[in-house]
């Protein structure tokens, strides 16, 4: 199959001592506390920011699992690649990782890394620019079946590329309300009622697209309901009607049928307990988190760039700190 790091994860124990997680996105982030668990924080938003460059890893900082330690699928899109091209493939392509990561110890790298740009992540949202511009019609780099994001190509056309502007009649999924009023920093509360109202009023004239959407309490559930209401992941029927965005990919001529194209699996690490600075080896993983990307990744324009990944916790992808 073509199941990849962003749409499948599994965990298993070997001889009762060591647990592994397989086919995960090579991402890691620092937990706010040792007791922070995915299942207890479903529906809450996290803001992951580039971390680890010559400084202590703070809660909410993200980095990467060392790509040189990853066994690449010899039949997948990442075969034979190295350097930035390998990074881009492991983070952006559908399929390509066969390595199982030992939960008792992974090697990590800082998130601020030459060549790692927002473009690598944002192909999932039908945004193809910079080093990913040539991938827009490559099925291995297809966007998700729902790419509502509240931004559109500047000056018309179907591809955002390097030129984007805020949509005047659509909005992307909102952040937790506490981020807007400044009462939370990196880890949200899961309350997005105000943003939800704006989202439904702007995109749907105040009428939910389905009963499932009306009943959805999380952004990921709403996203899935939108896809289902428009005929599913394999359909090209518009999600939004008569607006600047259809909700379906308009730049790429491909579309992943799998809604999990906007899901990443990230290793949650208790960075404070291990006094990690910069790159580090053999760092224990508390748990692998499934995270739904709610909006395109932000890039501050520096070199190498600082990135912001906004996502909603879906639940656990396995781990829980070791043997079972």
Where are these regions (language model features)?
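N-linked glycosylation sequons
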Residues: 1-324
């Amino acid at each position: 199959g073509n199941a990849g790091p962003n749409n499948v994860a599994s965990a298993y124990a070997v001889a009762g001592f060591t647990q592994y997680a397989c086919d995960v996105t090579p991402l890691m982030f620092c937990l706010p506390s040792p007791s922070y668990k995915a299942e207890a924080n479903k529906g809450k938003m996290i803001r992951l920011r580039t971390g680890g460059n010559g400084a202590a890893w703070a809660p909410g900082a993200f980095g990467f699992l060392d790509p040189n330690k990853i066994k690449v699928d010899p039949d997948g899109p990442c075969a034979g690649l190295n350097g930035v091209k390998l990074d881009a493939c492991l983070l952006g392509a559908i399929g390509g990782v066969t390595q199982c990561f030992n939960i008792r110890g992974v090697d990590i790298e800082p998130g601020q890394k030459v060549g790692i740009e927002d473009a690598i992540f944002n192909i999932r949202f039908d945004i193809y620019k910079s080093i990913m511009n040539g991938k827009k019609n490559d099925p291995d780099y297809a966007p998700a079946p729902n790419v509502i994001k509240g931004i559109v190509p500047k000056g018309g056309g179907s591809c955002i590329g390097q030129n984007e502007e805020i949509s005047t009649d659509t909005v992307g999924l909102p952040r937790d309300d506490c981020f807007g009023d400044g009462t939370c920093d990196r880890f949200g509360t899961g309350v997005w009622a105000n943003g939800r109202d704006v989202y439904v009023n702007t995109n749907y004239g105040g009428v939910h697209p389905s009963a499932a959407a009306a009943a959805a309490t999380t952004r990921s559930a709403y996203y899935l309901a939108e896809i289902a209401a428009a005929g599913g992941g394999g359909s090209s029927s518009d999600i939004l009607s008569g607006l600047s965005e259809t909700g379906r990919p308009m730049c790429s001529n491909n579309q992943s049928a799998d809604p999990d194209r906007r899901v990443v699996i990230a290793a949650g690490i208790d960075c404070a307990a291990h006094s990690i600075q910069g790159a580090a080896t053999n760092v224990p993983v508390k748990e692998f988190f499934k995270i739904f990307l709610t909006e395109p990744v932000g890039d501050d324009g520096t070199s190498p760039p600082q990135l912001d990944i906004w996502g909603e916790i879906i639940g656990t992808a396995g781990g829980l700190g070791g043997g079972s």
